[in-house]
Design a protein with these regions (language model features):
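Long amphipathic alpha-helical coiled-coil segments
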Residues: 67-79, 113-138, 184
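Short, charge-rich amphipathic alpha-helices with coiled-coil/heptad character
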Residues: 1-5, 19-59, 85, 132-148
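Short cysteine-rich clusters marking metal-coordination/redox-active sites
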Residues: 204, 230-233
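Short linker/helix segments within small regulatory modules
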Residues: 218-227
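Short Cys/His-rich local motifs and their 1-3 flanking residues in nucleic-acid-associated proteins
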Residues: 209, 232-235
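Coiled-coil termination/hinge junctions
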Residues: 145-206
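Amphipathic alpha-helical coiled-coil segments
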Residues: 53-65, 106-127, 173-174
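Short, non-ligating residues that shape and space the ligands of small metal-coordination modules
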Residues: 213-214, 239-240
Length: 246
């Protein structure tokens, strides 16, 4: 294939644009801001899970406090009833002994329940404190997520803008290229990754492999408008303007 030297050099500009588009795509897929956002989101979710577990624990201990308070209240009412009977003077000696024994049992039961209630209330206080601290931590992490989200979105927007600029530049360059030369370039780019490279110091600018003397001689003997290919990577070899042709 033959193509004007200027056309061939346009391929180098196009290859530069395509390389930048590849870099932008890679950057978009590996954004540090995305990783920071993912980490912040994971931490927030873990904190929210811990907050949920503490909320359940707090509900459970509240229910236990309510149950114990009800039991203590029931024992006290029973004690009040027994004392009222004792004070009434209407019970016989057998009933009196039974009431006194029951009162002793009830007083012991009340003391035990109050001790248990005190322990549970202390546990409730501890869990409530942990819950409040965890809620504050979760809220702080939520704010971190929003900051990370904004940074991620700004970085993504910057990449999108840069990609749009490169796409526009590519459209401009391809509009000035011969259709057959562009098709050859695009076909190589799809199959080999890099469509064209500058021949410099005996090396292919696409694959960076040094060419042997025989290949260099063949290239030197070729006409300026001859479209050359790298024997290693098959990229289009573009010769420097100052050394093009014989």
């Amino acid at each position: 294939m033959k193509s004007d030297v200027a056309q061939q050099h346009l391929l180098l500009k196009l290859a530069g644009v395509d390389a930048e588009l590849v870099r932008l795509t890679h950057r978009a897929a590996h954004l540090p801001e995305q990783q920071a956002y993912d980490q912040a989101l994971a931490e927030e979710r873990a904190a929210t899970d811990r907050l949920g577990a503490l909320a359940v624990a707090l509900d459970d201990v509240e229910a236990e406090v309510t149950r114990l308070e009800a039991e203590v209240d029931a024992v006290r009412r029973r004690e009040d009833r027994d004392r009222s009977l004792l004070d009434s003077g209407t019970v016989n000696p057998k009933q009196l002994a039974e009431l006194q024994h029951e009162l002793t049992t009830l007083e012991r039961r009340q003391a035990d329940l109050e001790d248990i209630l005190l322990e549970v209330m202390e546990r409730r206080e501890q869990i409530a404190g942990d819950h409040a601290a965890q809620r504050a931590a979760a809220e702080a992490l939520g704010r971190d997520v929003e900051v990370a989200r904004q940074a991620r979105d700004e970085a993504s927007a910057g990449i999108d803008q840069a990609r749009a600029e490169q796409d526009a530049r590519r459209t401009e360059l391809t509009a000035g290229l011969d259709a057959d030369l562009l098709a050859l370039y695009d076909g190589q780019r799809v199959s080999g990754g890099i469509g064209a490279g500058l021949l410099q110091a005996g090396r292919c600018g696409a694959c960076r492999i040094e060419l042997d003397r025989g290949e260099i001689g063949r290239i030197a003997a070729a006409s300026d408008d001859e479209v050359l290919r790298c024997p290693e990577c098959r990229a289009i070899l573009v010769r420097p303007l100052k050394t093009a042709g014989r």
